[in-house]
């Protein structure tokens, strides 16, 4: 049954994450907790499908306080797929070197803040720019 095969694969991925990344997850959680405890922000950013976790972390009733989503509208999927602000413009923007630096100019950061960047590939220029600026 295909559903069981999917579940088996999903469990395998989770087990691999637990075996290889648990310490890194704990370190990241500590960095974020320290920022929030200091009264500062955990800034979150992603583009394309990676805006979904950013949007889900947006503070609302019953959610965790301390997360600050950085949503750059042209890099979300609130745009059209073709035509005006379509996929070609989106791909250009997420790959344009320097665009992340320009986004970061809109925000004030403190040394006690941290940033969580979501990416499916880790290679798009806008994510790399954002990470370097946050560093």
Regions found by a protein language model. Give the residues of each.
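Generic N-terminal amphipathic, Lys/Arg-enriched alpha-helix
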Residues: 1-20
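Short, glycine-rich nucleotide/cofactor-binding loops
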Residues: 14-24, 115-124
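A short, well-structured juxtamembrane/interface segment
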Residues: 20-37, 103
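Glycine-rich phosphate-binding loops that contact phosphosugars or nucleotide phosphates
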Residues: 37, 44-135
